[in-house]
């Protein structure tokens, strides 16, 4: 179970709504994912329509909607978008995104922190998308963010956990949930994040652009469940599991030592 603010989730796979070829396919894939937290860009929602093509089907799912401030280039724009979402959708949850760089969509750390401080004071449950910067994530936690969402790699890149070392530091020191967001392009990436100790992952592009989004959504669901189970079971020491540095050994260890067996053979030879 994962608790963020006042809500408990049984699924650690959060999903997005962009890039699907149709609202119907989006809805089917989201159902297959088992996701209970779904993010949506306010800039893509027709707030004047009571039957918006994106919003209406999402409300059928009975999940928590997480409006995001994608498109905001400054703290002020993000704050305005968050307030608009609260009024339009009757939610105080917001995924805070401030990325003025239109090419790489990298989050602006200064503007993100500024906006987070204001929104937290206004009673929002703030989940900020941010760079994999341990210092920034700690500052966001200190101003009251309910979780932090550091990137694995640039949005939509499908490159996986290119920031792994920094993610590990963030996970180790964080007192709020860590949700790896952006760049997760395969179920194996999601599994890796959960094994590393992340509390959840957010996936959009890898599901939406797959040949079969529904099957891919289900694959991510299984990967996240497997990653969490593996972490809870206790991963053995290896260079890929730095959570056990004291037991790390860069040499082979036989699972079935031959010492006793060879000794018996030597004794038989002498008989």
Curated annotation (Swiss-Prot):
It comes from the Bacteria. The gene is thiG. Pathway: Cofactor biosynthesis; thiamine diphosphate biosynthesis. Keywords: Cytoplasm, Schiff base, Thiamine biosynthesis, Transferase. Its EC number is 2.8.1.10. It comes from Yersinia pestis. Its main location: cytoplasm. 1-deoxy-D-xylulose 5-phosphate binds at residues 156, 182-183, 204-205. PANTHER family: THIAZOLE SYNTHASE. GO terms for molecular function: thiazole synthase activity. GO terms for biological process: thiamine biosynthetic process; thiamine diphosphate biosynthetic process. It is found in: Cytoplasm. The lineage of its organism: Bacteria, Pseudomonadati, Pseudomonadota, Gammaproteobacteria, Enterobacterales. This is Thiazole synthase. The active site is at residue 95. Homotetramer. Forms heterodimers with either ThiH or ThiS.
